[in-house]
Amino acid sequence: ESTEDEKAMQQMVERLFPEYASQFSFEQSEKIDKDWYEIEAQGGIVRIRGNNANSMAVGLNYYLNHYCLTSVSWYVNDTVEMPEVLPMPPAKITSTARCKNRFFLNYCTFGYTMPWWTWKDWERLIDWMALNGINMPLAITGQESVWYRVWTKLGLTDEEIRNYFTGPAHLPWHRMSNLDYWQGPLPKEWLDTQEALQKQIVARERQFNMRPILPAFAGHVPSELKRIYPEAKISRMSSWGGFEDKYRSHFLDPLDPLFATIQKEFLEEQTKLFGTDHIYGADPFNEVAPP
């Protein structure tokens, strides 16, 4: 019976070029200290072995690039141009990874076209990431749903929370504490759909042996928190990008006991929704001066 990694690879080729799927075979083999793959032609079948799905995907990409002279883009509507007859490698090809951790994406990427992506767009990007050996992707979609739960638990109202968030296109800069409120309030329906999307994203990334890097609390808080915690050491950040002062964000002193409380609440709520691989990203002072 096929392993989960072998199934993941077979499903990938069925998504990318279904008419050729039966001509590929994937075999998960014993692990060594490094990620590795092996490509070999056997009886008209391209056999790709590796220690996991991620490694086998890199092997598949090598075969596509060097033998089919084609490439897979991360845009779902781009077809993969394949030769009429699959070329068979004349000799066995083997390769091992040069580095263990292979990171991809940044905070701003999630504010260009990604706010409007559907699962089909993400599915293709994750295939592309696997083909290119990415195993530590930044995964920050849907975090507002986590924050909504945390801020509600701490006493903020629905209106206060959703007004504090920016509109979808500016959320990456809101997350990096550049601005608040701009083009809000964020609809509750949007929070819910992004939460569902993130569940699909991290599940598929883990299927390809990736460890999604989830967000952690970096000190950025709603100004309304001062209403509930008047003694908290909350400072105002510098202005950013020419926006009016009313959009400036607020920062909680990491030495304030409330900081650890919020961090714990956030990580616990996030883990309930999305699981964890125990790797987190935080970007507290992007293009703003620390208080």
Language-model segments: residues:
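Bacterial Sec-dependent signal peptides at the C-terminal "C-region" and cleavage site
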Residues: 1-3
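Aromatic-lined carbohydrate-binding surfaces of glycoside hydrolases
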Residues: 20, 28-33, 42-54, 58, ...
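Aromatic-residue-lined binding/catalytic grooves and analogous aromatic/hydrophobic interfacial grooves
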Residues: 66-67
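Glycine/proline-rich low-complexity spacer/linker segments in large multi-domain proteins
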Residues: 71-76
